[in-house]
Amino acid sequence: MTDWRIADVWEAIARKTPNRPALIQGQRVITWGQFDARADALAAHLVAGGVSAEAKVAAYLFNCPEYLEVYFAAFKAGIAPINTNYRYGGEELVYLFDNADAEVVVFHAGFADTLEAIRSRLSKVKLWIAVTEPGHPAPAWAVDYETAVADAPPARPVKAPWGRSGDNLLLLYTGGTTGMPKGVMWRQDDLFNVLGAGGQAARGVEPIESPQGAADRLDPEGPRPPLTMVCCPLMHGTGQFSAFITLNQGGAVATLPSRGFNAVELWNEVERLKADGVVIVGLAFSTPMLEVLEVDPGRWDLSSVLSISSSGSMWSQENKRGLLAHCVNATIFDSFGSSEAVGLGASASTPGAEAATAAFVLGPTCAVFTEDGRRVAPGSGERGLVAVSGFLPIGYYKDPEKSAKTFLTLEGQRWSVPGDWAEVNADGTLKLLGRGSQCINTGGEKVFPEEVEEALKTHPHVRDAVVVGVPDARFGERICAVVEPDGAVELELADLSAHVRNRLAAYKAPRELVVVDSIGRAPNGKVDYKASRARALKSLGLEG
């Protein structure tokens, strides 16, 4: 099939197994039949609300069942869903919604005050829909989400006047390495294919050949399809795409009841639900998960866990070994990719055979190229940029210049080259070296240093500032501010962090401070980031 429409697949599954769970959060369970009906009602509400065929629907939500209902509704209506980082501040949200041409924003009502302050600047938004919660009713200018999904329309499934197509988009906004968020444009057909076309090779599940094929392989009274505990945010590609892979098989996606990650709660839920899959992002999750298991080994029955999957952040061989000691039936899958390049590489770890940190097997459609377009030969020691071909995004939304820099024609075919440097070992495996830019990856969140530097430099007593990443046992890296003061007062980390949090998302605020006499910029105004980081490491006692 060459025109996959994700809603068609999910609707076929809902018809076959309407009483099976699709979405779980704590004691709340949305069956496949309810998932389909609620998404139909929301899709009808969007179409009746006057959205255009090019509409974008922003999900400004914490993890919750409504998140995936919004995506299902957008797929049904043939319009594009977009993710929204719920940690963003007002200015970041204005940029994102304006850049995306968002016509609908579905938000947790707890964000109402933030949106109220910027709503007048978002003239493109036609519909505001609030997911209410205790203490946070829908504001007067928004529709209550439950009102929007209360009644499924008589004509189902819902389709907009412009219909559905495999060309319908999903926009995945990523902070990336070059400043403000960029919207990666995935055609539904390409996305469905790159995510396994309804299959999952790691579990031996074959791709399907038609939407009905997804339903035909399900038995309402037979073995349970996958139940995946997605611990990381659905607003990021790792969580979102992992959820899609599970739903494409007719499985259930479970999210944690709490807003923040709690390892004890995770293992409680895994045991209660007998989850067979767990999705995380590297050290920020695996470290606390392992710590609570080590404190009380044997507390939980984790025999149901068959896979622990991670992508978006490197994590250690030691953590993999530790988790496998407690999840004895599991395989750990560590994937290397990005929003614009799915499937660059992967590693699989089993008890006694744990993959090393940053070691990956190249994907079947991947290669490593030098900057002048030559393939890197295995064992040559030459460094190059990892690239993937096959099913790729169209490019970045409204940014042809950046699209041209990332999506290249090499050896006569189109490749996505997101900027990750690597060497190819003699056995063909990949040794990942990292992103060539100065982007800082802290717990899976990408932070662009210049953005934080500019915020720091608005402080009345900061003359100049540079931001670097320093090692962090849990988050991979943490933000360090190297600051040149004006000399009037003694700068304090708490004050500078609060200053940044007032302007940017909290995860971008510095957690370390190094005060210097001079930043030491070159005559052209540029700074030596390598030297700045070395200076920070020395000052913090982290060198060597």
What residues fall within each predicted segment?
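Conserved AMP-binding/adenylate-forming core of the ANL superfamily
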Residues: T2, N19-C64, L68-F72, G89-V94
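Conserved AMP-binding A3 loop
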Residues: T31-G33, L169-A197, A201-I208
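Structural core segment of the AMP-binding/adenylate-forming
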Residues: A48-G49, I79-A150, V489
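AMP-binding/adenylate-forming catalytic core of the ANL superfamily
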Residues: Y88, V94-Y95, E103-F107, N268, ...
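Gly/Ser/Thr-rich phosphate-binding loop
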Residues: E146, N248-Q249, A275-I280, L290-E354, ...
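Conserved pre-ATP/AMP-binding loop-to-beta segment of ANL
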Residues: A152-Y173, M180, M185, R217-L227
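Conserved AMP-binding/adenylation subdomain of ANL enzymes
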Residues: F192-V230, M235-D276
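Conserved beta-loop-beta connector loops within the AMP-binding
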Residues: A367-A387, V424-D427, V489-L493, D528
